[in-house]
């Protein structure tokens, strides 16, 4: 497996992975456009991918402008292999090196993602919208978890 920074040429494969997921499914696949992905990768933040045999099997994108994790998705065939954990680590290491001390994300309740974030030490802090759980991570908490 190869972990690397995402580039605009990765967007078609990123979109494929995004649409393969079984949980946190987009109600309308057209809601997240290639242009949205490009903006988040090149203007608002940065992204990373995991490749296996030349195919992208997971990706993560951080949004500096809104101080949130815009996306972290793994092809369901590759879940449980540590890809999400590694992408999260790469992303948060970079994010907190950008003079940021706080980041949040939203995810649907009763999903593998919810359990992943809880296990990773994210703190639940209310709702994001009407149905998503809002999780937060703080730089000092993250760094403490990394060293101990």
Predicted regions located by residue number:
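Conserved GNAT acetyl-CoA-binding A-motif
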Residues: 95-108
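A short beta-loop-alpha structural element at the N-terminal edge
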Residues: 1-16
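Conserved GNAT-fold acetyl-CoA-binding loop/helix
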Residues: 15-42
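A short helix-loop-beta-strand connector motif used in the catalytic cores of GNAT acetyltransferases and
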Residues: 38-49, 68
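Conserved acetyl-CoA-binding loop-helix of GNAT-fold acetyltransferases
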Residues: 80-93, 119
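A short, internal acetyl-CoA/4′-phosphopantetheine-binding micro-motif in the GNAT/acyltransferase core
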Residues: 72-80, 107
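Conserved beta-strand in the GNAT
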Residues: 49, 55-63, 68-73
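Conserved active-site alpha-helix within GNAT-family acetyltransferase domains
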Residues: 85, 109-126, 133
